[in-house]
């Protein structure tokens, strides 16, 4: 049995290929059934995200194993083998375990240390239940990887610093305001970055959120999710005074918030400070706003410097995380090797028990017929010894006849003679 990981990801293949190798949730059971029907596959888990498609397998080693798996993958997706082959990577046994642990810990992600991948790996494991039901080593590998990912999060700072624009904006807000539970945030736009920012803010219990967007319908969907109020872009001038923090990210070609608008808002607020985080390109906030007293304006470039600093911190933490993964992978493989010999030990013990029961039964029968007890016990001990050492003796003799000194040494060592 061999543990095997194969796949493609954002490092090895463009999105035009990755999107054609994905496994949709609707057809996952069908894919697993097809995969498990391959004679060499004992168990499998399919991980398919926007950045990677990977198969984690328990397989029987055989000739042309890689070719057979590539052929299955390409046949299933109706792809040309040559198109896929150069983008695939393969990891066996210890390397497969290390790879899964790295993936689950966010060490192999497009955004180093991102936490979402652990949830995706857990979901893949759950959704692939039929694929690993009869592959205990595969189940154990995933369960161990989940605990390693948790350890990496706990013992390192891999996820402590913001490395996305949305998260950096929220981190900046939390640094300036002691608590978000007393502030009102206005989010301008309703795109992906604003969605991420809204979710971060909700997690930190912001007092109130106002979403201003050109299309109210899209904004309303996000507002329903995070518990926010929706206004139109034309309402910003009137409502700006209510916001302590403004995070803006639209596709507008012209600024949405100007100096005059901010002056009116600050006057209405009696010059209580306002934080503006403009992450739009082109900018949503006129640069002159940053010159106003009590208006603290940060651009996407300011955030990038924060992100680069934090990314450097994550890379430093990743060194520690890699050490944890290496240690845990080695320990897991040692455990797995010990498990692989357990069945052999059970068979050997059962064989010895069978000999014991056979000879003991004969000895007891002899005792019942009135035979000499001491002679019967001596005979039992002699026969038991001879039967138990018969096979090791034959192995020693054969090794000697073959002139195999290394095998002789191993046999002597295993018998406790060295």
Curated annotation (Swiss-Prot):
The active site is at residue 50. It catalyses: (S)-4-amino-5-oxopentanoate + tRNA(Glu) + NADP(+) = L-glutamyl-tRNA(Glu) + NADPH + H(+). The record marks 99 as: Important for activity. Pfam families: GlutR_dimer (PF00745), GlutR_N (PF05201), Shikimate_DH (PF01488). Pathway: Porphyrin-containing compound metabolism; protoporphyrin-IX biosynthesis; 5-aminolevulinate from L-glutamyl-tRNA(Glu): step 1/2. GO terms for molecular function: glutamyl-tRNA reductase activity; NADP binding. NADP(+) binds at residues 189-194. It is an enzyme of class 1 (oxidoreductase). GO terms for biological process: protoporphyrinogen IX biosynthetic process from glutamate. Keywords: NADP, Oxidoreductase, Porphyrin biosynthesis. Its EC number is 1.2.1.70. PANTHER family: GLUTAMYL-TRNA REDUCTASE (PTHR43013:SF1). Catalyzes the NADPH-dependent reduction of glutamyl-tRNA(Glu) to glutamate 1-semialdehyde (GSA). Possesses an unusual extended V-shaped dimeric structure with each monomer consisting of three distinct domains arranged along a curved 'spinal' alpha-helix. The N-terminal catalytic domain specifically recognizes the glutamate moiety of the substrate. The second domain is the NADPH-binding domain, and the third C-terminal domain is responsible for dimerization. During catalysis, the active site Cys acts as a nucleophile attacking the alpha-carbonyl group of tRNA-bound glutamate with the formation of a thioester intermediate between enzyme and glutamate, and the concomitant release of tRNA(Glu). The thioester intermediate is finally reduced by direct hydride transfer from NADPH, to form the product GSA. Belongs to the glutamyl-tRNA reductase family. This is Glutamyl-tRNA reductase.
């Amino acid at each position: 049995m061999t543990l095997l990981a194969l796949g493609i990801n954002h490092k090895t293949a463009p999105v035009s290929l990755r999107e054609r190798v994905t496994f949709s949730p609707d057809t996952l059971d069908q894919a697993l059934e097809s995969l498990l029907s391959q004679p060499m596959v004992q168990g499998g888990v399919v991980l398919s995200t926007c950045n990677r498609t990977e198969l984690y397998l328990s397989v029987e080693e055989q000739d042309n194993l890689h070719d057979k798996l590539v052929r299955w993958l390409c046949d299933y997706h109706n792809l040309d083998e040559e198109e896929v082959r150069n983008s695939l990577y393969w990891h066996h046994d210890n390397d497969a375990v290390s790879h899964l642990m790295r993936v689950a810990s966010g060490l192999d992600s497009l955004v180093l240390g991102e936490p979402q991948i652990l949830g995706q790996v857990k979901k893949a494991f759950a959704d692939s239940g039929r694929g690993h039901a009869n592959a205990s080593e595969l189940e154990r590998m995933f369960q161990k990887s989940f605990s390693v990912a948790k350890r990496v999060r706990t013992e390192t700072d891999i996820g402590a610093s913001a490395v996305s624009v949305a998260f950096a904006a929220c981190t900046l807000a939390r640094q300036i305001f002691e608590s978000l539970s007393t502030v009102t945030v206005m989010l301008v736009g309703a795109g992906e970055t604003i969605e991420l920012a809204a979710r971060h803010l909700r997690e930190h219990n912001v007092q109130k959120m106002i979403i201003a967007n050109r299309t109210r319908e899209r904004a309303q969907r996000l507002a329903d999710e995070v518990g926010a109020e929706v206004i139109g872009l034309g309402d910003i001038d009137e409502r700006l005074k209510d916001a302590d923090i403004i995070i803006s990210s639209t596709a507008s070609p012209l600024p949405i918030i100007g100096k005059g608008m901010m002056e009116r808002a600050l006057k209405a607020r009696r010059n209580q400070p306002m934080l503006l985080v403009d992450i739009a390109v082109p900018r949503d906030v006129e640069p002159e706003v940053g010159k106003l007293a009590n208006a603290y304006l940060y651009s996407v470039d300011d955030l990038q410097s924060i992100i680069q600093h934090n990314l450097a911190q994550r890379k430093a933490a990743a060194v520690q995380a890699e050490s944890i993964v290496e240690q845990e992978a080695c320990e897991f493989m040692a455990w797995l090797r010990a498990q692989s010999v357990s069945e052999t030990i059970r068979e050997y013990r059962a064989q010895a028990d069978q000999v014991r029961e056979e000879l003991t039964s004969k000895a007891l029968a002899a005792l019942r017929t009135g035979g000499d007890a001491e002679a019967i016990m001596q005979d039992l001990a002699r026969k038991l010894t001879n039967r138990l050492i018969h096979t090791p003796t034959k192995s020693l003799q054969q090794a000697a006849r073959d002139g195999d000194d290394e095998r002789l040494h191993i046999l002597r060592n295993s018998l406790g003679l060295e």
